Design a protein with these regions (language model features):
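Phenylalanine-focused residue identity feature
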Residues: 11, 15, 52, 118, ...
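Surface-exposed, flexible loop/turn segments at secondary-structure boundaries
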Residues: 12, 99, 164-166
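Residue-level micro-sites within transmembrane alpha helices that shape
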Residues: 1-2, 130-133
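Intrinsically disordered, low-complexity segments enriched in glycine/proline and serine/threonine
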Residues: 5-6, 124, 168
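Fold-level recognition of mixed alpha/beta catalytic cores in primary-metabolism enzymes, strongest
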Residues: 150-168
Length: 168
């Protein structure tokens, strides 16, 4: 997971602060949280335009980091704005937060048992294509970057996109 966090920052335009021994400690310190968030989001999936609990979790986390938060973007989306302490460009990082009307067929302890309405039918819902992981990683990247705000040149937008798979 740490390698994914580092890669996300490297490819996001945050290269200048993505390296160094101090940040390695930050990545390592947050790794367990990211895994926990991913499992919680996986176990509690929400279909597109219904990601109310997911959006609330994201917004609370970003606010706890001192990141400016806008909710209700595209109905259930969340955007966080982290202004670095030095002038510079704006970089956007994005994660999709919706799940799919698909049954989960495994025995993981954090398996989804959530049901939702899709096209008038009650259906099983799960994160079948990684949106839970994308969301958890971006929450982790936000935490590391907020902690290192003094090293950031410019502004970072954290975009948590709802209904990427299309409305149910």
């Amino acid at each position: 997971m740490k390698k994914v966090l580092i890669a996300t920052m490297l490819f996001s335009g945050c290269f200048a602060i993505a390296q160094g021994p101090d940040l390695q400690k930050d990545y390592t310190a947050i790794e367990g949280k990211v895994v926990e968030w991913r499992r919680d989001i996986h176990q509690n999936p929400e279909l597109g335009n219904r990601e109310f609990k997911t959006a609330e979790k994201i917004a609370k986390h970003l606010e706890s980091l001192g990141i400016e938060v806008k909710t209700g973007v595209a109905y259930t989306g969340v955007v966080g704005l982290l202004k670095g302490e030095q002038p510079g460009k704006v970089v956007a990082l994005r994660a999709d937060i919706d799940a799919l009307p698909v049954p989960e067929r495994n025995d993981l302890p954090y398996k989804s048992t959530v049901m939702g309405e899709f096209m008038g039918n009650e259906v099983p819902v799960m994160h079948a294509c990684g949106h839970d992981t994308h969301t958890a990683i971006l929450m982790g990247v936000a935490e590391v970057l907020a902690k290192n705000k003094n090293k950031i040149k410019g502004t970072i937008k954290f975009i948590f996109q709802p209904s990427e798979e299309g409305p149910p």
